[in-house]
């Protein structure tokens, strides 16, 4: 019997290499034990940087003594896109990566917010280089993340994303719901990205002479009259998984038939209810 080849997975994020979310993701991947793990992540938080990269100033790259066992770990003084570019073009150019993961982000990246997200920006960069990728984000706060059974789900998502064949590599944007009463997640749903939007309200924090300093961190939801399937999935305690090649993204490469096939394939390959004690079946 032929042994399945272990995947080579790059892990990055936008919360920084010391963040709780990336540590959780590595723990789950180590538990699933199907891949060799390589970490290239920002030294400092880079939230809201989208696909920005260091065009003018040099970016520093240095080995990082990661507390969990990984093949290699590197810290970068730039953005998540810088991390992906350096990983593909320098660190691992002789040994191709199979998949790139970004997260787990502290806060959701659903709806139109994915255009601002540096977590998702890293995934878009990976796709541009022909590498499949997954963004993972926890709604509200990383403290809401439920670790039970997640190693199995993460592995299923990874293997599905790598195996999916299309003209362009698959990018998935996965969001985990925040259960206010700690009720277990019901399952996972394949959705399209919604039109919901988080916008920042300018807040004056101080004035120095003629210069005024503002923050945009006070975020408010702007929801359409008709809720998207992504929004409803999260609101009803389901994990959402939205393809970045769907019709509302710049890379609108899937026909309706291909999108339907992707949805069917996802539901057949990734649904994890058979091995878990879920409260209800998926619709």
UniProtKB/Swiss-Prot annotation:
- List the record's Gene Ontology CC terms alphabetically: cytoplasm
**Stretches assigned to coiled coil:** none
What cystine linkages occur within this chain? none
Q: Does the keyword Zinc apply?
A: no
What does the record give as the reaction this protein catalyses?
a ribonucleoside 5'-phosphate + H2O = a ribonucleoside + phosphate
Q: Which UniProt keywords apply?
A: Cytoplasm, Hydrolase, Metal-binding, Nucleotide-binding
Highest taxon of source: Bacteria
Its biological purpose: Nucleotidase that shows phosphatase activity on nucleoside 5'-monophosphates.
The Swiss-Prot or TrEMBL record describes its family as follows: Belongs to the SurE nucleotidase family.
**Can you say what this protein is called?**
5'-nucleotidase SurE
State the organism's lineage: Bacteria, Pseudomonadati, Chlamydiota, Chlamydiia, Chlamydiales
């Amino acid at each position: 019997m032929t042994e399945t080849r272990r995947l080579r997975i790059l892990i990055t994020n936008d919360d920084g290499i010391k963040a709780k979310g990336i540590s959780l993701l590595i723990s789950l991947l180590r538990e699933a034990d199907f891949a060799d793990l390589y970490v290239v992540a920002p030294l400092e938080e880079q939230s809201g940087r989208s696909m920005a990269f260091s065009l003018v100033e040099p970016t520093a790259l240095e080995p990082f003594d990661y507390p969990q066992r990984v093949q290699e770990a590197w810290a970068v003084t730039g953005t998540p896109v810088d991390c992906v570019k350096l990983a593909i073009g320098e660190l691992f150019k002789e040994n191709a990566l199979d998949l790139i993961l970004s997260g787990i982000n502290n806060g959701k990246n659903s709806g139109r917010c994915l255009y601002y997200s540096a977590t998702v920006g890293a995934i878009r960069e990976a796709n541009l280089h022909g590498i499949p990728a997954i963004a993972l984000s926890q709604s509200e706060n990383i403290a809401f993340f439920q670790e039970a059974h997640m190693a199995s789900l993460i592995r299923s998502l990874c293997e599905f994303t790598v195996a999916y064949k299309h003209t362009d590599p698959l990018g998935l944007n996965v969001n985990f719901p925040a259960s206010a009463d700690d009720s277990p997640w019901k399952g996972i749903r394949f959705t399209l990205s919604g039109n919901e939007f988080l916008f920042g309200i300018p807040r004056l924090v101080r004035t120095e002479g003629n210069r005024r300093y503002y923050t945009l961190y006070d975020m408010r939801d702007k929801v359409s009259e008709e809720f998207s399937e992504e929004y409803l999935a999260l609101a009803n305690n389901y994990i959402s998984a939205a393809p970045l090649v769907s019709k509302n993204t710049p890379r609108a490469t899937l026909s309706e038939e291909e999108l339907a096939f992707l949805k069917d394939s996802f539901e057949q390959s990734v649904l994890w209810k058979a091995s878990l004690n879920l409260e209800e079946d998926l619709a």
